[in-house]
Amino acid sequence: TADYGRATSVAAKSLKARMLLYAASPLFNGNPDYANFKNPDGEQLLSTTYSEEKYKRAADAAWEAIELADAAHYKLYESTSVSTSYPEPNDLTQRSLRMTFIDKEDYGEVIFAETRKAGTYSIQRKSIPYFPRGSWNGIAPTITMIDRFYTANGLPIDEDPEFNINNKLDIVTIPDGTTYAVPGRQTLYMHMNREPRFYAWVAFENGYYECRTTAVSYTHL
């Protein structure tokens, strides 16, 4: 639409809701670490007193943003078909998660888009695994971030009895029938049996990676 990428009323309400949520969070709500966080006049910039009312303000602002977005016909993105030019995950959930912020036709869910064109040495090339065409994987999630993804059972990795967190760095062989990695090859234990968001957003050793045309289909790292 003509307003795509602009600071619309929906974008403003959404940003307000997010800021109030930050204000209510333990990071800012009663955090004693900010006791000496003052301006040059000695005035306290962040209160160190906890206030439950901040959560109510955040919730009210979020509901206001949701109602406004609903009236403006925003909706959750769903990728309904696989591209004929480039390979994409066949699983609907994984494909929708992957394409939400990639599909340039996604005008339904994205509220405040970055519309500037990226240059040659953009975040895209810094994020893509190294290949001869000029990508070098200079940006990657930390192990701590990887640990935050849930297991295939929808549980944190330290709460799922079927996931042995002590073996997360062990090298394992990918079993036959695996759809998110190459069967028979090796990867780390922590890459196995994770939730759809993990496979939609994280590239890992011998996991499938859509970096070629459909004529070649998936390749792997």
PLM regions and their residue ranges:
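Active-site neighborhood of glycoside hydrolase catalytic domains
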Residues: 16
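An aromatic- and glycine-enriched ligand-binding surface/loop that stacks and positions planar moieties
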Residues: 10, 20-218
